Curated annotation (Swiss-Prot):
Protein name in UniProt: Very-long-chain 3-oxoacyl-CoA reductase
Species this protein is from: Mus musculus (Mouse)
Gene from which this protein is expressed: Hsd17b12
Pfam families listed in its UniProt record: adh_short
Subcellular location(s) per record: Endoplasmic reticulum membrane
Pathway: Lipid metabolism; fatty acid biosynthesis; Steroid biosynthesis; estrogen biosynthesis
Catalytic function, reaction form: a very-long-chain (3R)-3-hydroxyacyl-CoA + NADP(+) = a very-long-chain 3-oxoacyl-CoA + NADPH + H(+); 17beta-estradiol + NAD(+) = estrone + NADH + H(+); 17beta-estradiol + NADP(+) = estrone + NADPH + H(+); 3-oxooctadecanoyl-CoA + NADPH + H(+) = (3R)-hydroxyoctadecanoyl-CoA + NADP(+)
Recorded GO CC terms: extracellular matrix; fatty acid elongase complex
An example molecular function term from Gene Ontology annotations: heparin binding
EC supergroup of this enzyme: oxidoreductase
Mode of membrane association: Multi-pass membrane protein
Keywords of the record: Endoplasmic reticulum, Lipid biosynthesis, Lipid metabolism, Membrane, NADP, Oxidoreductase, Steroid biosynthesis, Transmembrane, Transmembrane helix
Length: 312
């Protein structure tokens, strides 16, 4: 009777162990996907975290959709944005539709001397949810040195996309820690997952928001605070210049209804199942291939914009 050589037995167990490991990983991934996208965590976000929700950039798009969803769940809403007229309009609509108290704070997040006013406006409120949504992008994809009014654009992008997240969190977080509960939703972007050339500064600011969120969650999860980085692909909003929703470019309302169910389940989320699939594809794509595709896409958008501007 012949015996298999020791090496053959070793390789068998290496192969069997590898297959078992991959099968377990695949099973766990499927379970998590079912838990997040089919079951969700509907009940976590609501007034039990605190009476008030604060939403920056809450008069349009994703911010407005979050404000409405939180009001629908019975939370009082503080809207912070630039235009008092828009704030009044959205605030009154929320008040009438959902029968909740609302407040507004009109500030321009491109400036850096606004935070005392915000602090005064939030004073004494039991804030359970903060949505750091305010943001800006480029008018169109462009090479770094050719960005119109470059120095001012750099300052505005950093003030609006980065400084606002840090400073408003600084104002709200102490109260959450004191009460040992709270949720902070920082709206990053899929542009923060992987670099997006021709949107260089925007992409970098959104990567900051993602890293800030991950670190903050690790620092304060033991205090009862859940911090989530929300990283959507394209959503049909004014900022994205998309008017008509599609399957892969949902309306802000559809996106938020999906994303809010991931709170407590994912600290980093694309917020929407189709976007999750897109993220998975991008993550396994060779980097050279990704850059070739995304650079071609950015150049195409740039050329289309410049041709249209030239005609006008």
């Amino acid at each position: 009777m012949e015996c298999a050589p020791p090496a053959a037995g070793f390789l068998y167990w290496v192969g069997a162990s590898t297959i078992a490991y991959l099968a377990l990983r695949a099973s766990y991934s499927l379970f998590r996907a079912f838990q997040v996208w089919c079951v969700g965590n509907e009940a976590l976000v609501g007034p039990r975290l605190g009476e008030w929700a604060v939403v920056t950039g809450g008069t349009d798009g994703i911010g407005k959709a979050y404000a409405e969803e939180l009001a629908k769940r019975g939370m009082k809403i503080v809207l912070i944005s630039r235009s008092q007229d828009k704030l009044n309009q959205v605030s009154n609509n929320i008040k009438e539709k959902f029968n909740v108290e609302t407040r507004t704070i009109a500030v321009d997040f491109s400036l850096d001397d606004i935070y005392d006013k915000i602090k005064t406006g939030l004073s004494g409120l039991e804030i359970g949810v903060l949505v750091n949504n305010v943001g800006m992008s480029y008018e169109y994809p462009e090479y770094f040195l050719e960005i119109p009014d470059l120095d001012n654009t750099i300052k505005k992008l950093i003030n609006i996309n980065v400084l606002s997240v840090c400073k408003v969190t600084r104002l709200v977080l102490p109260g959450m820690v004191e009460r040992s509960k709270g949720v902070i939703l920082n709206i990053s972007s899929a542009s923060g997952m992987l670099p997006v050339p021709l949107l260089t500064i925007y992409s970098a600011t959104k990567a900051f928001v993602d890293f800030f969120s991950q670190c903050l969650h690790e620092e304060y999860k033991s205090k009862g605070i859940f911090v989530q980085s929300v990283m959507p692909y394209l959503v049909a909003t004014k900022l994205a210049k998309i008017q008509k929703p599609t399957l892969d470019k949902p309306s802000a309302e559809t996106f938020v209804k999906s994303a809010i169910k991931t709170v407590g389940l994912q600290t980093r989320t694309t917020g929407y199942v189709i976007h999750s699939l897109m993220g998975s594809i991008n993550s396994i794509m060779p980097r050279w291939m990704y850059f070739k595709i995304i650079m071609g896409f950015s150049k195409s958008l740039r050329n289309r914009y410049l041709k249209k501007r030239k005609k006008n």
